[in-house]
């Protein structure tokens, strides 16, 4: 039998239906992939795989990696406190390009070379005697950029095309027992094979480094609180500040070179301030440096660098202050046609120096020193 519902009954029925909750299917959160403790990559696909997986692994081991031509072994997106270990030989295929061949960034990163491991880009394939000044385009090797509170231990780098290690934007980086061996470039056209180029960084400590190359062993272009100690430099241009000037950051403050040897090199100690530029070189110390077989300049301090040593007008825009040079041993170290000590300063631009126990002989006295602070001397 059919019964008709009145208006009040219909209203009550509709209200009850609307008040009844609709049962939807239950949803669950997507599972979170756990970060693996250790990942190992090898072979020709290893570089790309490591780059893709760098946020997933607490420890990344690169074992006998071959990096394809024209690409960077890119570990610039590492999670905090990641460890990177190089095993065996890491090699790179050939291409003419700017690089870098290797790039590592991050916070709390530990980079290690296992016993017997080598990073060998086989730079001889690019060497033509012109370095970064011409010839074929050569890739820079290792960008250690934007590393904070990080360490690099026991890396062995062999035969870079040009500059080896660029340190930039780092704060709290410690490098121990690194070897950069470009000695093969002495007779095969290696050029501009700088060991460590440092800029815009602070609290950098390099200990026990061995650098065999054809340019600066260390060049500090800007930065604060930088120390290089217990090092061996051979074949290059010595322990350098600069050139300073003409960059975004033109301040060098509190840099120490100590207990190191420079041999078979063009220069021993060199400070280069660019002619006509502005900046500041302050609180630099060279202490306990031993010089051997220096061809051109035992100690060179210049405020007229203009692309070449002593080439420009002497200017005062980059003062050199609070400089300490002490306990320098170089008796007979300079070639007979080289210069023992050269100091060329602008007016009132070199002040508050400390100069003690400096013995650099074998070469000539430079007859055109300018504005030498009273504590120092160009004569030996």
UniProtKB/Swiss-Prot annotation:
Keyword check for Cell division: no
Pfam families referenced in this protein's UniProt entry, alphabetically: Glyco_hydro_28
Residues of the propeptide: 20-35
Repeat region (PbH1), residues: 147-169, 170-200, 201-222, 223-243, 252-273, 281-303, 315-338
SMART domains xrefs: PbH1 (SM00710)
pH dependence, record text: Optimum pH is 4.8.
Glycosylation sites: 327, 352
Temperature dependence: Optimum temperature is 48 degrees Celsius.
First-listed, main subcellular location of the protein, grouped into a coarse class: secreted
Keywords, alphabetical: Cell wall biogenesis/degradation, Disulfide bond, Glycoprotein, Glycosidase, Hydrolase, Repeat, Secreted, Signal, Zymogen
Catalytic class of the enzyme: hydrolase
Family: Belongs to the glycosyl hydrolase 28 family.
The protein's name: Endopolygalacturonase AN8327
